[in-house]
Amino acid sequence: MSKFLQGSIFSISKLHVRYSSTRPFLVAPSIANSITTEAPAINHSPELANARKWLPKRCGLITRKKGMMPYFDKSTGERSAATILEVNNVEVIMHRTSEVNGYFACQVGYGSRHLSKVSRQMLGHFASKVVNPKEHVAEFRVKDEKGLIPPGTLLKPSFFKEGQYVDVRSVSKGKGFTGVMKRYGFKGLRASHGTSIMHRHGGSYGQNQDPGRVLPGRKMPGHMGNEHVTIQNVKVLKVDDENNVIWVKGSVAGPKNSFVKIQDAIKKT
């Protein structure tokens, strides 16, 4: 075994076959595994690792997508597509703290739900936090304890300001099992000139006996949609506390009445 360690870790396993260099190790493997750094352990603590994360400073909102409408800017007359997001009885339920959970976050609930449609576990959770049962619950991570909002606080559309940028998260529409032309925009093969039953095929999926397999990441038919999608730097066009809606520029992934999470844009703060 000592003779094996004198060379490379990939030593000769077959006669007259060399797989890599036979240069000796600079440090024996047994010694390398026992080397410890002189840096204090606090540099690698979960608290400092969490502090290094790029996180928003404020909590976010849960909204419901109601549809799209054109929006006209009064100052410039510019017309742009806008998505209308409804804010209905959004309330802070509880906190996550670094001392207990290892990170800071606010748990937020949307709307209200009848007691008969809430599981016993969630009923106990809402009762312990002294809030009414919610239709949807989500968690928003924040940078530190300054971003925590007192439980029971109702959040309104004015939580965001007109003109600011936000990150929008939602689940896209499910398209089912689709081919490569619909899923990835492949051109497909010829319609005629000898092409048979391969018109919408993806072409070659591999090479030859070497490597003898389909390489990872190959674009192939499969389930399309129903994925978590984040759109960054979306502009807030209008905030309406009277009607409890937020207008954001452009489209948002997901069908109507789907839940959408909004938080301050991480790349604009």
Swiss-Prot record:
Keywords assigned by UniProt, alphabetized: Mitochondrion, Ribonucleoprotein, Ribosomal protein, Transit peptide
Transit peptide: 1-19
Record has Protease as a keyword: no
Cystine pairings recorded for this chain: none
GO molecular function: structural constituent of ribosome
Keyword Cytoplasm: no
GO cellular component, one term: mitochondrial large ribosomal subunit
GO biological process: mitochondrial translation
Subunit note: Component of the mitochondrial large ribosomal subunit (mt-LSU). Mature yeast 74S mitochondrial ribosomes consist of a small (37S) and a large (54S) subunit. The 37S small subunit contains a 15S ribosomal RNA (15S mt-rRNA) and 34 different proteins. The 54S large subunit contains a 21S rRNA (21S mt-rRNA) and 46 different proteins.
NCBIfam families documented for this protein: L3_bact
Entry function: Component of the mitochondrial ribosome (mitoribosome), a dedicated translation machinery responsible for the synthesis of mitochondrial genome-encoded proteins, including at least some of the essential transmembrane subunits of the mitochondrial respiratory chain. The mitoribosomes are attached to the mitochondrial inner membrane and translation products are cotranslationally integrated into the membrane.
Other remarks on this protein: Present with 3200 molecules/cell in log phase SD medium.
Name of this chain's protein: Large ribosomal subunit protein uL3m
